[in-house]
């Protein structure tokens, strides 16, 4: 069977990639990622049971989160690392199984008979009260990449034959991938929430359950949105407690004459470590793409060698990384297949990877040694200037709520007629120029609320302000879509409305990968309706599942700029 992947917006032909991913991943990489997901589901069978009886599941929790994150679009293209993850997963699964069996031996008193029956059932051990055959995901075994390859042929997306069940399972899985990304960042800062892990494991197990109906899976998808809100709130707490609340900031987009390191991705802990280790070395630090919002945090402003932001959204990195001249650190997705001209200057860390690119691992205490990349930078020329000037951002919920009286007054007086949430992702497709044209064409009495790399379609346009309020309010990274939800809920309270959809807020969101999926599900959980997704609807939504979202939540897509603005403003 050839590869099949349709998890991102750029799925070939709007249906799915079957020869090679548009993202650049090979058939072998795609299938190994399928197998990682299958291994994770097997681990979840045991970890959910272990959690129920009070066993420590921290090792499994960590592995599940990191593994889901490693399969997000544009995160990891390193076959060796991915195969090693499969091998490690089988060991984690076996360790959990052994712990449950050991615990069962000491919990077989009369009052624990029902529990004993239950855990024996989970293990596939027959007993007179409860017989259950354990799922293959919990028992299959292999020892080498060739055997992994054979197994991967049988466990891909298309292994689920029913189109609607497949669609719901994948929608749930992609939501979990986005959730895992946000949870990983919170964990790196020492923040965690057991209920989120418990839901992730429950949901993973549910994707293996052939007895679940479409209605039951739909309910789980919506429940995923609830935990999406929880995980974004957790990450918001982790980021702001550690680095302070983002504040209005003018960010330099020019360059200086010192050698520099360009840091891309989302991990603020990596950002902190890099700034600390480069201080006093003569090496400057620049953010790229989704790391731009690091400029808004007070804790990072004390570093004089933190220059600003270089370049634009992830998909332009081939040209921009070449022009930067210095080394690049990829902390998370999005990686584009690197050009030979800068591949030897590229470094990955965390769950990211690319074959032939140097990887920086964390030590046992979680620390990372960036000395190699710093020494590399010293041997490089300073960055080539590709633009100059400043952009403004830092409008997360704390900052916007501090401006609440000004904002509320502008709404009440009619100075601001409508807000447009244009959060989400940027991408390569030319049809995404729609979002630039849309921003330009919006009436002057409207304000754009944004988060994520979608902002690069319009954050350098001169759209002016309304009574001192910029017409583009950038909350931060894609996870900071949480801030936009908090702002909306506060406005609902201030205006004493019963329904969040009564607010003068429209949602025109550009999506690309799986973090956008969890943001969408979170918004649905909060009751937001009539969200428009573009530039196309997800390929993984079957006609029937898409119909459910349209009929129950008013989900739509985009048409032309003029038609859409007319529709939104009426």
Curated annotation (Swiss-Prot):
Catalytic activity of the protein: A + NH4(+) + H2O = hydroxylamine + AH2 + H(+)
EC code: 1.7.99.1
Full protein name: Hydroxylamine reductase
Name of the top EC class for this enzyme: oxidoreductase
Entry's Gene Ontology cellular component terms: cytoplasm
Annotated binding of [4Fe-4S] cluster, by residue: 5, 8, 17, 23
InterPro entries: HCP/CODH, Hydroxylam_reduct, Prismane-like_a/b-sand, Prismane-like_sf, Prismane_a-bundle
Keyword Iron-sulfur assigned: yes
Gene: hcp
Cofactor annotation comment: Binds 1 [4Fe-4S] cluster. Binds 1 hybrid [4Fe-2O-2S] cluster.
Swiss-Prot/TrEMBL cofactor(s): [4Fe-4S] cluster; hybrid [4Fe-2O-2S] cluster
Described function: Catalyzes the reduction of hydroxylamine to form NH(3) and H(2)O.
Pfam families registered for this protein in UniProt: Prismane (PF03063)
A GO biological-process term: response to hydrogen peroxide
Modified residue annotations for Cysteine persulfide: 425
Subcellular location per the Swiss-Prot or TrEMBL entry: Cytoplasm
HAMAP family, alphabetized: Hydroxylam_reduct (MF_00069)
């Amino acid at each position: 069977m050839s590869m099949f992947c349709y998890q991102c917006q750029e799925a070939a032909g709007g249906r799915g990639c079957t020869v090679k991913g548009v993202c650049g991943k090979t058939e072998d990489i795609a299938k190994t990622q399928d197998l990682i997901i299958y291994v994770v589901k097997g681990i979840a069978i045991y970890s959910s049971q272990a959690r129920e009886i009070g066993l420590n599941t921290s090792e499994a929790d960590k592995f599940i989160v990191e593994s889901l994150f490693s399969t997000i679009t544009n995160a990891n293209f390193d076959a060796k690392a991915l195969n090693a993850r499969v091998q490690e997963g089988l060991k984690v699964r076996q360790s959990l199984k052994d712990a449950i069996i050991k615990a069962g031996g000491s919990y077989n008193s009369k009052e624990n008979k029902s529990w004993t029956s239950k855990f024996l059932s989970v293990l596939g051990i027959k007993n007179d009260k409860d017989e259950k055959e354990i799922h293959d995901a919990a028992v299959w075994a292999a020892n080498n990449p060739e055997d992994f390859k054979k197994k991967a042929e049988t466990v891909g997306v298309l292994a689920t034959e029913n189109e609607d069940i497949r669609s719901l399972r994948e929608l749930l899985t992609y939501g979990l991938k986005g959730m895992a990304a946000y949870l990983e960042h919170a964990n790196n800062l020492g923040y965690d929430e057991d209920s989120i892990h418990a839901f992730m494991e429950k949901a993973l197990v549910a994707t293996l359950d052939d007895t679940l109906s479409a209605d039951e899976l739909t309910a789980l998808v919506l429940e995923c949105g609830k935990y999406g809100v929880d995980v974004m709130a957790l990450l918001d707490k982790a980021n702001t407690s550690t680095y302070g609340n983002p504040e209005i900031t003018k960010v330099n987009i020019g360059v200086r004459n010192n050698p520099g390191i360009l840091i891309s991705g989302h991990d603020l802990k990596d950002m902190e470590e890099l700034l600390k280790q480069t201080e006093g070395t003569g090496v400057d630090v620049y953010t790229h793409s989704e790391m731009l919002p690091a400029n808004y945090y007070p804790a990072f402003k004390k570093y004089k060698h933190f220059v600003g932001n270089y370049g634009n959204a992830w998909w332009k990195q081939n040209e921009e990384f070449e022009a930067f001249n210095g080394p690049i650190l990829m902390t998370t997705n999005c990686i584009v297949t690197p050009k030979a001209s800068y591949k030897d200057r590229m470094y990955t860390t965390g769950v990211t990877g690319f074959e032939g690119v140097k990887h920086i691992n964390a030590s046992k205490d979680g620390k990372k040694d960036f000395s190699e990349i710093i020494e590399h930078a010293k041997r490089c020329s300073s960055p080539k200037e590709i633009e100059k000037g400043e952009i403004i951002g830092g409008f997360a919920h704390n900052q916007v709520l501090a401006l609440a009286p000004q904002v509320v007054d502008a709404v009440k007086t009619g100075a601001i007629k409508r807000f447009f949430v244009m959060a989400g992702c940027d991408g390569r497709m030319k049809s995404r120029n729609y979002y630039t044209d849309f921003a330009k064409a919006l009436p002057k009495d409207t304000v754009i609320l944004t988060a994520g790399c979608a902002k690069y379609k319009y954050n350098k346009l001169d759209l002016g302000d309304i009574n001192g309020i910029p017409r583009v309010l950038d909350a931060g990274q894609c996870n900071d879509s949480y801030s936009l939800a908090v702002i909306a809920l506060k406005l609902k309270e201030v205006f004493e409305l019963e329904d969040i959809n009564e607010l003068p807020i429209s949602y025109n969101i550009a999506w690309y990968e799986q973090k956008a999926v969890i943001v969408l599900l979170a918004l649905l959980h909060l009751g937001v309706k009539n969200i428009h997704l573009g530039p196309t609807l997800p390929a993984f939504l079957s006609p029937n599942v898409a119909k459910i979202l349209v009929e129950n939540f008013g989900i739509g897509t985009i048409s032309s700029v003029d038609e859409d603005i007319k529709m939104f403003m009426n």
